[in-house]
Amino acid sequence: MHSYDFALLLAFFVIVLLPAPWLGRFYYKVMEGQRTWLTPVLGPVEQGCYRLAGVNASQEQNWRQYTLALLAFNLVGFLLLFAVLLLQGYLPLNPQNLPGQEWSLAFNTAVSFVTNTNWQAYSGEASVSYLSQMLGLTVQNFVSPATGLAVLVVLCRGIARRSATTLGNFWVDMTRATLYGLLPLCLLLALLLVWQGVPQTFADYAHALTLQGADQTIPLGPAASQIAIKQLGTNGGGFFGVNSAHPFENPTAWSNLFEVASIILIPVALVFTFGHYVKDLRQSRAILACMLALFLIGGSTALWSEHQPNPALESTQVQQTAPLEGKESRFGTTGSVLWAVTTTAASNGSVNAMHDSLNPLTGMVAMVNMMVGEVIFGGVGAGLYGMLLFVLIAVFLAGLMIGRTPEYLGKKLQAREVQLLVATLLVMPVGVLVLGAIAASLPGPAGAVTNPGAHGFSQLLYAYTSGSANNGSAFAGFGANTVYHNLMIGLAMLIGRFGYILPILALAGSLAAKKSAPLGQNSFPTHGPLFTGLLLVTILLVGGLTFLPTLALGPIAEHLSLGF
């Protein structure tokens, strides 16, 4: 590694960590309706939205009403996006006259963007019109992270409130999350990207004559605005087929730094938002320490692995510094690994290098980041509510070990809460192991694998892990655009999204109804290094150990067989 690599890593952590406490407090004030510096500008817009939609902003909902509103909103969003993708050939803003997507691909794409996964079994510039990109995909890029943020806020209220029957208003939370939480930051990032050369235009694709005399089509479009929310909303779906490896999505080292840092900017800030809800920022610091520890362990492993020379070239005269297959030379190995680890630690899924070309252990780190439930920062809202589930599980295990009724911040965890926690633990195994095993055992679906042996199995394992974790990245050699995989990965995405959201909303309702006992000397502290260590071990054992046999058949076997 060179001095530039260390400067990149330092700048990344400074951009992410320095504004996090301030931004976390801002999100708390926004979601609770307190006045902020944006209120004079956006307050009238917010109130106008409520009047237009007929929403009574002062009327809160119980968890069942909140759940029904959330499901109805997401269902309507899915149907609208599905229709736009099917009918885009008949709709305006389609200068390339692209036809509508095939029905199973349209289903997969609509589910993907509604669930904040952004799995793409298509190439954007070749199959999606400008209107579909803006009216369909970009809209969901805003409302899907806003949904995750709303669910997180409900869980925070459930932990913080006492003897309460209501948890907020879904329509109010969605409006505030979108208007205050996402739009201003996206506007700023979009302007920075345009400054760096990312296109933002409605012009037709350009045509150029190459030096060889051939005609080349150069895709354009309103890219900067979608890329901004793609990164900040932990969406990840690229405007172009190769995502942020494309020079129009990510042209410079500066744009690369802005984009990779923006992936976890909001998820890190929301850790501090939780601390403001429970009036104890020590809880935030303990959770953030665990997240950073897991991130640094995975990142260090991936950097070491990816800087190893390829054993297959040792007998040749080729001088190896680091493997650059599948990477952009303008980003280098460290910039590519940093992105790969960050995008899988969050439920983002965007890429600036091809994950299918990563060394086996680097690919395994990416998979493990997803397999533990996307709790290492995770998606907007989704990452922290997933981490809080592990916090409650760790508290439950600690209670079993010391023979006391487990409680978290004065709220006792009883049978109903534990049952809901266990239900969430089944989400990833069902999506990855059950659906993945079925796909691997059927000759038709297994034919999507384009490599033999362990790496081929890793391709399939990565696909179903990515779908279940709502990540969206892929080993791109996997032939995902078949009716079977479009439907089954779509099912995995739905399980991975709503298999968490529904139990969490029920859990929030149950916790909110409880009284809060004052913390005493015998209470198990959840803000110190001991609990941080317990939480880390819980995540690795409960969340990760389940998948060790499949990892042994995939990336571990490949690593050993290649002689690294």
From Swiss-Prot:
InterPro entries: KdpA (IPR004623)
Recorded GO CC terms: plasma membrane
TM region positions: 4-24, 67-87, 135-155, 179-199, 258-278, 286-306, 382-402, 420-440, 487-507, 533-553
Subcellular location: Cell inner membrane
Entry membrane topology: Multi-pass membrane protein
Keyword annotations: Cell inner membrane, Cell membrane, Ion transport, Membrane, Potassium, Potassium transport, Transmembrane, Transmembrane helix, Transport
Gene Ontology MF terms in the entry: P-type potassium transmembrane transporter activity; potassium ion binding
Keyword flag Transport: yes
Keyword Ion transport among record annotations: yes
Domain of life, source organism: Bacteria
Task performed by this protein: Part of the high-affinity ATP-driven potassium transport (or Kdp) system, which catalyzes the hydrolysis of ATP coupled with the electrogenic transport of potassium into the cytoplasm. This subunit binds the periplasmic potassium ions and delivers the ions to the membrane domain of KdpB through an intramembrane tunnel.
Family designation: Belongs to the KdpA family.
Subunit composition and interactions: The system is composed of three essential subunits: KdpA, KdpB and KdpC.
Name this polypeptide is given: Potassium-transporting ATPase potassium-binding subunit
Organism: Pseudomonas putida (strain ATCC 47054 / DSM 6125 / CFBP 8728 / NCIMB 11950 / KT2440)
Gene: kdpA
